[in-house]
Regions:
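Structured core of small recognition/catalytic domains
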Residues: 190, 198-200, 210-303, 307-310
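A short, acidic/glycine-rich surface segment
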Residues: 7, 51-55, 88-93, 181-187, ...
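Conserved active-site tyrosine of GNAT-family acetyltransferases
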Residues: 32-37, 119-123, 212-217, 314, ...
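Short glycine/proline-centered loop/turn elements that form peptide/ligand docking sites
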Residues: 30-31, 48-53, 210, 229-234
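Vicinal oxygen chelate
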Residues: 2-15, 24, 46-48, 62, ...
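Short, structured motif recognition centered on aromatic/hydrophobic residues
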Residues: 19-23, 36, 67-69, 76-82, ...
Length: 350
């Protein structure tokens, strides 16, 4: 039996809950708050840092004003809007799909994917800067390689998913068909878009070293439960969403809330989904446009049970540019770092 010393915790430092926030650099907080309200978000606490404090925590020599956006009673999948006095750059921009190293995107469940598509199509007709991937049906049996349902004979179990890319926002929406997963997203039926909190967030790498992702489960303590190759033939939705070339393969790795189970009843939202291409793939590198200080989706946060203990693990686990533990713009203790895959993160004391 392990011995313990009174007053000293033996709990391993670990992330807790689901992915906490998707951070979005914006030029105007009020305008972006109004945008996200249509997806069921509401403004919570505001906070600020001067340029010296922002440099120490985020590595950005610019004053910062932020607001956290909540969604119903969700404790994960939230949004943090970050208004930099001097942004680094304009961010990832508007591309026809999500394919690039540095890519980040947020995913929400919706009660009607066609409702979202109608708004996006109308915005495009009006000349707004927007890229749209229309709803694509992903039948679960086809994706997993199992026998799919016969049309007009058996229920089709799957999702329709679509992508909306704007200068500041990289959003994916999906609607379920033929199944329920009660802990995986809660839709606000009263908002314009009838959407949930972020059920998961994504990032993309082009790296032949599969071990680079061990950092997320072995250091941060997330639950890896899906890790598989997706050849072109099985990538029904991914072909368009990730811009696959004919015959090209890719890999998907899911890192979940440590409490999440595998059954539909036990699965929890708050997932980190990582898409990996081979290093030789033709994938643009925009990682320098996807870090704190950039406009658009530029940072993810997670909460941890022991911030100082996790700081030591991250230092020893291959991360770089690890800040000291500081106070963030909301008064929480936090530190930032760059993971071995090149992506920026901030961890907060739970």
């Amino acid at each position: 039996m392990a011995q313990t010393t009174p007053g000293i915790s033996t709990v391993r430092p670990s992330c807790v809950g689901g992915l906490y926030e998707l951070c979005v650099g914006v030029p105007d907080l009020a305008e972006s708050i109004a945008y996200y309200e249509r997806f069921g978000c509401r403004a919570g606490r505001f906070g600020s840092l001067d340029s010296a404090a922002a440099l120490a925590l985020y590595g950005v020599d610019s004053a910062l004003r932020s607001v956290r956006l909540h969604h119903l009673d969700a404790d994960h999948g939230l949004v943090r809007l970050m208004q930099w006095e001097r942004p680094r750059n304009d961010g990832l921009g508007v591309d026809p799909n999500l394919r690039c190293v540095g890519s980040r995107w947020g995913v929400r469940l919706t009660a009607s994917v066609l409702n979202v598509a109608n708004h996006a199509a109308r915005a495009k007709e009006l000349g707004q800067p927007i890229a749209l991937i229309d709803p694509i049906l992903a039948v679960i049996g086809e994706v997993t390689g199992e026998a799919a349902a016969r049309p007009f004979a058996e229920p089709i179990v799957g999702v329709r998913e679509m992508v909306v890319i704007q200068p500041l926002y990289r959003q994916v929406f999906f609607e379920r068909f033929g199944y329920q997963s009660p802990l995986y997203g809660r839709v606000d039926p009263g908002c314009v878009m009838q959407t949930s909190q972020h059920t998961h967030a994504g990032l993309m790498i082009a790296n032949d070293d599969h071990q680079v992702l061990r950092f997320y489960d072995e250091v941060l303590g997330l639950k890896r439960w899906f890790d598989a190759e997706r050849p072109y033939e099985q990538a029904t939705g991914s072909r368009t969403i990730f811009g696959l070339e004919p015959g090209e393969t890719h890999w998907m790795v899911d890192f979940d809330d440590p409490r999440s189970g595998h059954s539909l009843e036990e699965r929890r939202s708050g997932k980190l989904k990582i898409v990996r291409f081979a290093k030789s793939s033709r994938v643009a590198d925009k990682l320098d446009r996807s870090r704190p200080g950039c406009l658009g989706y530029s940072l993810y946060t997670w909460r941890v049970n022991d911030l100082e203990g996790m700081w030591k693990r991250v230092q020893a686990g291959g991360a770089t540019t690890v800040s000291d533990v500081r106070t963030d713009e909301f008064g929480a203790r936090a530190f930032s770092f760059v993971a071995p895959d090149g992506y920026s993160w901030t961890l907060l004391q739970a």
